[in-house]
Every structure is written in C-alpha cells, then in structure tokens.
Amino acid sequence: MMKQFWIGYWFKPWYFLYRIGYAIVISGIRGYFKNHQYDGKENIPANTGVLYAVNHQNAFLDPIVIAGRTKEPTHFLARADIFKKPMVAKILSMIYMLPIYRQRDGVDTIKMNQKTFDTCFDILKNKGNVIIFPEGNHNYKKSLRPLKKGVSRIALGAAEKYNYDIDVKIVVLGLDYENHFKMNGSLYLNAGTPIDVSEYYENHKKNPSETINNLSDRIYHTLSSLIINIKDDENYDELYYLLHRVPFENNSNKVSLKFKLRKERLEKIEKLEKTNASLYEEIVSFMSELKITMKKFKLRPYLLHQKPNSLLSLFLYSLLLILFSPFHIIGLTTNYLPYKTPVWFVNSKVKDKHFHSSLKMALGSLFFYLYWFIITIIFSQFFGWKYGILFFITLPLIAAFNYKYWIYFIKVRGLWNYKLNYKSILSLRVKYLNYYATIK
C-alpha cells in the first residue's frame, strides 16, 4: 500500500483531484486511527464489476476509508441535494460521486435515479466498482437497520441491460469503528465471500421481484454476520459500554480479535436475555451505574480487576512523567495546534456529528503538513536547510512520542485516582467482579 501511495497511483489515469484526495485519505487513515485492519481483502475479485454493500455508520468517512483501501477509483452514491450547484457537482463528479434522489428532493425520483442507475450499469460492465449503503442513511449506532433493495436492483438491472452477459459480484463489507467521533480508535474492515450475481440470473428472468427480495435477504444476513449488531435499542448505551469498555480476559490489541470477542460477548448477553431476563436486566442496570461512576472518578473498568498500586510505584511512574515532560512540551509546540484546530472548528461549526470524523481526519492531515512545513521553514532560517530537513523528518517521531506520553499520563492519572478513591468504589468493585464472571 505504501509503495502504491508514494509511487504507483500517481501515474494512474485518475482525476487529479481524486489523486490528491487519495493521498489525504491514506495519510489520514494512518494518523487518525490507532490501529486499522482489513480482513477478507483477498475476497475482492479482480477484472469484474464489483458492488460493495456496506453498513453506514459514519457519513462521509465510510466511503473514503473504503476508497482509500482499493486499487482503483471507487464510485459511490450520495444525496442529490449536495449536487445542486454546478461547480460543486463538477467537483463531486471528479471524485466519482453519483447523485441519488429521494422523495423529499421534489423531483421524479424514478426518472432521475434511472440516470444514476444506468451509469452504475455501465461502470459494472466496464469492470468498475460502486459503493452502496443499503441502509439508506447513516447512524452511528452499531445496529443494522432494514436494507433498501438498491444493491440487488442495480446488480440485476445491470445484468438485464446487458442481456445477462455480464460478470457482477457483490462484496458485502462490514465496517466497525471503535470510536465514531474521536481519533486514536481502531478501524476494522471485514469483507465477506463475494456473491456471484449470475446465480440469480435465471430466477430473475422468471420472477424479478421475488429474486430481488431473495438477494436482498442474503445481503442482510451476510452483513449482519460481519458487524456488531446490537438489537436492544432501549439499552443500547449500556450494551455498547459492556462491549467496548469492559475488558476481556484476552487483552490483545489485535483489531480482528477484539471484534471477535465483542461479537461473542454480544451473543452471550443476547442469549442471557432469553434464558434469564432478570439477570440480564441486572447487568444492564449495573452497566449504567458503572459508566456513571467511572466517569465521576475518571477511571476505566480494567482497573477494577486489580488492587491499587503502592505509593512507591505511583511516585516512580509520576517521576517518569516529570523527566520526559520537556520532550512533551516540545511535542506540544509542534503538534498541538494542527491537532486541536480541526477539532475546535468541526465541533463548533458542524452540527451533524456523523460528519465529524471525516472532516477531522481530512483537515487534520492538511493542517499537520501545512503547520510542519511552516515551522520547518522558520527553523531553517535560523539553523540552515540541512538541519531544517532533519527537523522535518523528526516531526512525525515527535508526534508519536507525544501521543504515547499523553496515553501514559492518562493511565498514571487513572492509577492515582483509583488509589485515592478505592474505598469509595470498593462495593462497586465487588459487584463488578461478580457480574464479570457471567459476561467475561
């Protein structure tokens, strides 16, 4: 991927704007997410038309993280209202976005969308890629909503247009974000085995509606198996906390393993809801209590698995923070503004939180490179260009150190808080360990 990023893709026959955007996305993914993993990419077929059917949790971030992991330009459908201005429509077409109309747009949706569908048919015939979010809208919740039939209609519509002499595959792709709205979480892309649309050609000729429904059902069940699907919406926040904050016995940082453990825990708690509803309600209620208490004392549940550290060890940990604080201050001068400026801007100007991550990632990439370029020029004026180049090379290393220092600071602060408030949360710890035996 890095070789392709720095050399190969610049020479591809893509729109220049798309190549610039691709560079930003590749850099952004590596900087914005602490860990990212793409499983099943060997399932992506080559030399054929591919329709990606993807769950939709994060507005514009969903398509760009997929586009950033593909070797060819990927088209995706977007709300038609953002195409209203001709200049904007031109720019959007240069990054391979296609308009999809809804009834609220006040147009003949069948007629207008048919143009987009015809374009998709041609893209698939020419062995291109199209991303579709069959849920129809975005929602940060890790719950699969009912699917629209657009994926099936486009796949089988392309077949019908070309007299069923076309090779089309549907790749069902699950996206999972550890944290939808903040950086340094993990990103997991999970591709299933491709669905060969030709399996449905004969039935589609005889009964189009039934075939579209059958294919859509298959997509739904496949997608559900590839994501975290919390069905209890009433207790969603508590279940999310249980899956993402309560630690596992296997404390691996591997993204795919964490995803697997979360799915297994969710299946266990869903089974408990059916077999022991009263215990299920107790655990859900306790998760609410746990979340409030942890927030109050600025703690994480993993601390409840251990007794407080000794004062000597806490002083030694704190001494390390003091010793390395000068390097942290240097890191703040070279990284704080480009890190915080996009956060301040997006949080204050963008109301829909579903767009926050994509904007923070894109703006953060631009701001970091711009800020580093400016301070390198200033540094070079005082110390010369040789040292200026060396300074620029060290900036990413300083940023990495600063991030590690901040994480270490948070952990040490948590250890101190746990030590100082242990008596206040002792009864909660006992309850937690009792429930953990059921949910671990």
Where are these regions (language model features)?
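Compositionally biased, charge-rich terminal segments
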Residues: 1-16, 293-319
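Intrinsic structural disorder
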Residues: 1-2, 100, 191, 220-223
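Intrinsic disorder/low-structure terminal segments
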Residues: 4, 247, 258, 431-438
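Soluble catalytic domains of membrane acyltransferases
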Residues: 11-25, 30-210, 328-440
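Exposed alpha-helical structural elements
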Residues: 16, 87, 119, 199, ...
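Long, charge-rich alpha-helical interaction segments
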Residues: 210, 217, 221-303
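Core alpha-helical transmembrane segments of integral membrane proteins
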Residues: 300, 307-348
